């Protein structure tokens, strides 16, 4: 996992140079949104279960996926879906705090699509639930932090698609 600071410093270090104006602007931007990201992470942590519950209600609960024969029909499958959504929320929050999506590749996306396909987990329903979670989260953390979190939810969705 990298954070925005490490990424900027490593880029300059590899080139054997001091931080240039563009690198310093990236750091300035990262630091200027620090309080916003920490407040958002605090709100998300305090409301994680409710965020996941509302996202499921908005996107999956009354669809064919929860009816007999659907992929979330049994309690075990439903619990696995809830667990996965909570996992995505947690790692999207980590990525937002770091200002870098690399943790999502390392800890979430590597092999996930293949695993879901082999288990018969519908990718489109997963993406739909993540998009619902993005909306629910934005309504709790406000438009600016919601936009920032949205980047990482979209990154997960893109990686699954």
UniProtKB/Swiss-Prot annotation:
The keyword Ubl conjugation does not apply. It is found in: Cellular thylakoid membrane. The modification N4-methylasparagine is found at residue 71. Keywords: Antenna complex, Bile pigment, Chromophore, Electron transport, Membrane, Methylation, Photosynthesis, Phycobilisome, Thylakoid, Transport. InterPro entries: Allophycocyanin_b (IPR006245), Globin-like_sf (IPR009050), Phycobilisome_asu/bsu (IPR012128), Phycobilisome_asu/bsu_sf (IPR038719). GO terms for biological process: photosynthesis. It comes from the Bacteria. Contains one covalently linked phycocyanobilin chromophore. It is a peripheral membrane protein. Pfam families: Phycobilisome. GO terms for cellular component: phycobilisome; plasma membrane-derived thylakoid membrane. (2R,3E)-phycocyanobilin binds at residue 81. The keyword Amino-acid biosynthesis does not apply. Light-harvesting photosynthetic bile pigment-protein from the phycobiliprotein complex. Allophycocyanin has a maximum absorption at approximately 650 nanometers. Belongs to the phycobiliprotein family. Heterodimer of an alpha and a beta chain. This is Allophycocyanin beta chain.
């Amino acid at each position: 996992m990298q954070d925005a600071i490490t990424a900027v410093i490593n880029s300059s270090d590899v080139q054997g140079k001091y931080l240039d104006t563009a690198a310093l602007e990236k750091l300035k931007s990262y630091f200027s949104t620090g309080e916003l990201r920490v407040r958002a992470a605090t709100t998300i942590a305090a409301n994680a279960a409710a965020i996941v519950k509302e996202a499921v209600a908005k996107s999956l609960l009354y669809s064919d996926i929860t009816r007999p024969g659907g992929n979330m029909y049994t309690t075990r499958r439903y619990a696995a879906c809830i667990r996965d959504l909570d996992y995505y929320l947690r790692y999207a929050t980590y990525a937002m705090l770091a200002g870098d999506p690399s943790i999502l590749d390392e800890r979430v996306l590597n092999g996930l699509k293949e695993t879901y396909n082999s288990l018969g987990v519908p990718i489109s329903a997963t993406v739909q639930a993540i998009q619902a979670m993005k909306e629910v989260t934005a309504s709790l953390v406000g438009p600016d932090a919601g936009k920032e979190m949205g980047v990482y939810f979209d990154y997960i969705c893109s990686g699954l698609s």
